Amino acid sequence: GVYKFSMAISPLDCMGCGVCTHVCPVGALTMQPLESQEDQQPVFDYMVAKVAEKKELQDFTVKGSQFRQPMLEFSGSCAGCAETSYARLVTQLFGDRMYISNATGCSSIWGGPGATSPYCTDKNGHGPAWCNSLFEDNAEHGFGMYVGQEKIREDLMSKTEQLIAIEWTQPALKEAAQKWLNTKDDGNANAEATKEYVAALQANIATVDELAAVPKFAEHAAELKAKGEKFCDCDACKLVAEILDKKDYLSKKSVWIFGGDGWAYDIGYGGLDHILASGRNVKVLVMDTE
């Protein structure tokens, strides 16, 4: 094959629960004293620093998901905790465009301990956006996150349509804008379309200095510069600037509500029932440990 496969384990981060040795169907792992495994730490560090994801191996199958970067790591949860296994898998599938509203409970303790976060980012700085409100209003809190970003995105769609309609908008920008609109409801396709759209927006906004280089616009450029403006104020450039200001909301988000059975089945049930009945595209992960 093209690639070789290896699993590197971080000895310094092992919780010592032994679950991996029990569930491995071929008995490939055994528990060993920490001091006998310390020479394996540089191997793990090398893998993290040097080995990149292989996009051609990734898909939404069980096997394919495991070739994707986990965006939940070293949480400090209890040894053998199953909650982090499920949460980690969700981040492998949707983490680079994920919003999480987390009910107070175990998952908010390992998920948001003071001064640190187990949720991480990829090489592009993209990763789960996590927030914890209270115990009883988690569903409403997550719903608010969804509706808020949806409203901003609807505004960006309107501005994009206006930008396409302007006669002097560059053809390449119009093409990227239309591709973004066409894929707006497809999370995977829209991720790539968003990258292309942002690049086209950044390449097609005229700065005041560029405007000043055109003789017929030189006087107007000087007026803009005196006001402290950085960009051309034509209708197209104003729309481009407004869209770029909210570029983090362009990609389709995957909004999740995390919580335990005490929240979902008891104190927060009324809110959860209301949110699910709304029909909005909000996902819920209930960690039932009762």
Residue ranges and their predicted role:
Residues 1-7, 34-65, 69, 97, ...:
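Ferredoxin-type iron-sulfur electron-transfer modules in oxidoreductases and energy-metabolism complexes
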Residues 1-2, 6-10, 15, 19-37, ...:
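Iron-sulfur cluster-binding cysteine motifs and their immediate structural context
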Residues 2-9, 66-77, 136-142, 253-257:
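Glycine- and acidic
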Residues 64, 72-104, 108-114:
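N-terminal amphipathic, basic-rich helices that act as targeting or association modules
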Residues 84-89, 99, 109-121, 196, ...:
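Thiamine diphosphate
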Residues 112-150, 286-290:
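Mobile "lid/hinge" segments at catalytic clefts and subdomain interfaces of large enzymes
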Residues 134-193, 243:
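N-terminal leader/propeptide and maturation segments of large enzyme subunits in energy/redox metabolism
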Residues 215-242:
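Amphipathic alpha-helical binding modules
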